[in-house]
Swiss-Prot record:
Organism field: Mus musculus
Key words of the record: Amidation, Cleavage on pair of basic residues, Disulfide bond, Hormone, Secreted, Signal
Residue ranges the record marks as coiled coil: none
Cellular component aspect of the GO annotation: axon; cytoplasm; extracellular region; extracellular space; neuron projection; neuronal cell body; terminal bouton
One Pfam short name: Calc_CGRP_IAPP
Identification of the protein by name: Calcitonin gene-related peptide 1
Residue numbers of Phenylalanine amide PTMs: F119
Described purpose of this protein according to its UniProt entry: CGRP1/CALCA is a peptide hormone that induces vasodilation mediated by the CALCRL-RAMP1 receptor complex. Dilates a variety of vessels including the coronary, cerebral and systemic vasculature. Its abundance in the CNS also points toward a neurotransmitter or neuromodulator role. It also elevates platelet cAMP. CGRP1 can also bind and activate CALCR-RAMP1 (AMYR1) receptor complex.
Tissue expression profile of the protein: Detected in nerve cells of cerebrum, hippocampus and pons/midbrain in newborns, and only in nerve cells of pons/midbrain in adult.
Protein localization: Secreted
Propeptide: 26-80, 125-128
Disulfide-bond pairs as recorded: C84-C89
GO BP, one annotated term: response to pain
Similarity comment: family membership: Belongs to the calcitonin family.
Amino acid sequence: MGFLKFSPFLVVSILLLYQACSLQAVPLRSILESSPGMATLSEEEVRLLAALVQDYMQMKARELEQEEEQEAEGSSVTAQKRSCNTATCVTHRLAGLLSRSGGVVKDNFVPTNVGSEAFGRRRRDLQA
């Protein structure tokens, strides 16, 4: 039974060792010397790359505008939702408020005496 647990580990480790032995180390100096030659682009490739980047930026800007419009429309829908006043709902609302407020509440936060010793029956000393 123990062999079945270790067999995938053994297979993976054997494959990793095989890959490590089959690869040869390349000096860092040769990589650095050859990189400027590999990064040269022709003028046509530069124009194509610039056009692709510009199209991507325009697409992202349109997506952000659509999301903002949907959020503006969605805010009226959330106002019509039925309110929930159970302890779980109130706790979730307070947690959401705290997470949205960020550092404002954290700067003014004063820790209270909370924990196993704070509420209910306390442990008695065994010395008595």
